[in-house]
C-alpha cells in the first residue's frame, strides 16, 4: 500500500455519476480558489507521509464539493474505482453555495478541512485514522510554526536530520541539523525558501563522513528547471 501522495479539491453543481463530465477544480462555483487551501494540505500531506499514513488501495484523495448533497454530508462517490486510473478516488461532500459564500475565509478553510477528515474515515483503517487525527490536530494547532520531519541518516560519526516548516504562502523552509552520536547538536542551518517540487528535488540523498555531510540533488529530469546544487557542510 502506497503512502498518501495528494489531496485535491473539486466542485460540481449536479450529482457526479458515471457517464457525466468529471468535476472541475474548486475555483468558480463557490467563489473559493482551491489554492487557498494548499498551505494546510501540504502541511498535512508531509506530516502524514512521515507518519506512514495510507488510504489503502489508492493514494490520491479527490474531494468533490457539490450542492446536490446536504451541507456537510460526506459520502462515497458513485463513480467508484476508475479501472484505468486506480490511484485516485473522488469523494462527495455536500456544500451549500449560499452557506459557504457567507462564511469567512477562516470558516471556509475549517469546513473544507473537516470534510477531508470525514472522507478519510470512509477509507482508512483504525490505525491510519489515528495517524490522521494526530497529524491533523498538529496542523490546526501550529500552522506555519509546525516543523515537519522529512529525512534523517546516521553514519559512523554523525547523525543528520532534515525538517521543514511550510509558510502560509506555501514556501518550504528547510532546517538541516547535524548531531554527534551522543545527540549533541553540532550544526544547525536554516535554508532559503523552496517551492514544493524544488524542495523534494534538492533534499534527495544524504552522505555522511567523519566531519562532513553532503546532500545530493535528484537526478530527475525535472531538476534541470531549478537552480539547485548539492549542499555540503563541514563540522
Labelled PLM ranges:
Residues 104-151:
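Long amphipathic alpha-helical scaffold segments
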Residues 125-142, 174-193, 220-235:
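Surface-exposed loop/turn elements that mediate protein-protein interactions on large endomembrane-trafficking
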Residues 154-155:
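Residue-level detector of Asp-centered blade-edge/turn motifs that repeat once per structural unit
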Residues 158-162:
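Structural core positions within WD40/WD-like beta-propeller blades
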Residues 166-169, 220-222:
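Short glycine/acidic-enriched loop and turn motifs that connect beta-strands
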Residues 1-114, 197-235:
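Acidic, small-residue rich beta-repeat scaffolds with periodic aromatic anchors
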Residues 144-151, 193-206:
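Repeated scaffold domains used in trafficking and secretory/extracellular systems
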Residues 171-174, 201-202:
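Short, surface-exposed coil-to-beta transition loops
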Amino acid at each position: 500500500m502506497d503512502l498518501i501522495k495528494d489531496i485535491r479539491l473539486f466542485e460540481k453543481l449536479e450529482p457526479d455519476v458515471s457517464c457525466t463530465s468529471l468535476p472541475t477544480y474548486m475555483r468558480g462555483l463557490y467563489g473559493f480558489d482551491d489554492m487557498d487551501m494548499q498551505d494546510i494540505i501540504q502541511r498535512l500531506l508531509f506530516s502524514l507521509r512521515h507518519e506512514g499514513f495510507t488510504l489503502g488501495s489508492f493514494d490520491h484523495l479527490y474531494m468533490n464539493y457539490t450542492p446536490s448533497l446536504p451541507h456537510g454530508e460526506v459520502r462515497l462517490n458513485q463513480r467508484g474505482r476508475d479501472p484505468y486510473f486506480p490511484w485516485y478516488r473522488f469523494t462527495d461532500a455536500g456544500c451549500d453555495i449560499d452557506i459557504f459564500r457567507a462564511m469567512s475565509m477562516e470558516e471556509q478553510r475549517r469546513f473544507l478541512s473537516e470534510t477531508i477528515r470525514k472522507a478519510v474515515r470512509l477509507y482508512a483503517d483504525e490505525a491510519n485514522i489515528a495517524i490522521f487525527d494526530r497529524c491533523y490536530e498538529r496542523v490546526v494547532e501550529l500552522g506555519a510554526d509546525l516543523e515537519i520531519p522529512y529525512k534523517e541518516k546516521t553514519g559512523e560519526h554523525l547523525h543528520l536530520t532534515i525538517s521543514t516548516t511550510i509558510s502560509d504562502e506555501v514556501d518550504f523552509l528547510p532546517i538541516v541539523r547535524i548531531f554527534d552520536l551522543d545527540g549533541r547538536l553540532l550544526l544547525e542551518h536554516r535554508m532559503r525558501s523552496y517551492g514544493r517540487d524544488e524542495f523534494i528535488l534538492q533534499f534527495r540523498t544524504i552522505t555522511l563522513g567523519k566531519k562532513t555531510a553532503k546532500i545530493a540533488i535528484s537526478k530527475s529530469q525535472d531538476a534541470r528547471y531549478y537552480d539547485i546544487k548539492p549542499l555540503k557542510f563541514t563540522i
